[in-house]
């Protein structure tokens, strides 16, 4: 029986790269890996209202550079930058090194897989009908420029006695085409009936050529210009 591979892991070093970008040997590798996990856990737990999509960690020399991609950067920065300074000090205590924080605004959270999945999970926890939440997310993504989207919800949906999986798809979502720019994320909804799992695939076009930084570059271009990155012409 065939199984779906993780679209992000499948495309690493093709048109995507890692969210932790550093090199270490021996004991330093394990220490830095644990630090990265603790940083991400703390950021997501401490700032649930900021709509954080991902945290990218780079370690040039003895500096730790943390980039937080969020739909509500004002929640992270706080009044006159007070909250971001507290966050920087806390992360510095966790890593034992100087921390540089960079906040990147996500202008279109409706086409960000992580934020879409988390939004559906939040609605399920508030007892919103799962079909309504899925359809609303699909319509918003397609309206704002996604070329295709697929959403899976699994668990005791609607309080049913037997767990099942429901899915909804619109547009085209290629799973095996490596040049496809497919954003993928998972989320959990902790309901009164148990845990429901949400998976989201969003197809944003194709990236031609071998460029591991292409996805990040397109995302940054979209934030600075405020327009959807155009699909590259076939050569």
From Swiss-Prot:
Origin: domain of life: Bacteria
KH type-2 domain residues: 39-107
GO biological process assignments: translation
Gene Ontology cellular component list: cytosolic small ribosomal subunit
Keyword Ribosomal protein assigned: yes
Record-linked InterPro entries: KH_dom, KH_dom-like_a/b, KH_dom_type_2, KH_sf_prok-type, Ribosomal_S3_C_sf, Ribosomal_uS3_bac-typ, Ribosomal_uS3_C, Ribosomal_uS3_CS
Keywords linked to the UniProt accession: Ribonucleoprotein, Ribosomal protein, RNA-binding, rRNA-binding
GO MF annotation list: mRNA binding; rRNA binding; structural constituent of ribosome
Subunit structure: Part of the 30S ribosomal subunit. Forms a tight complex with proteins S10 and S14.
Family statement: Belongs to the universal ribosomal protein uS3 family.
HAMAP family (alphabetical): Ribosomal_uS3_B
PANTHER family reported in the protein's UniProt record: 30S/40S RIBOSOMAL PROTEIN S3 (PTHR11760), SMALL RIBOSOMAL SUBUNIT PROTEIN US3C (PTHR11760:SF19)
Purpose: Binds the lower part of the 30S subunit head. Binds mRNA in the 70S ribosome, positioning it for translation.
Protein's name in the database: Small ribosomal subunit protein uS3
Protein species of origin: Sphingopyxis alaskensis (strain DSM 13593 / LMG 18877 / RB2256)
Taxon lineage: Bacteria, Pseudomonadati, Pseudomonadota, Alphaproteobacteria, Sphingomonadales
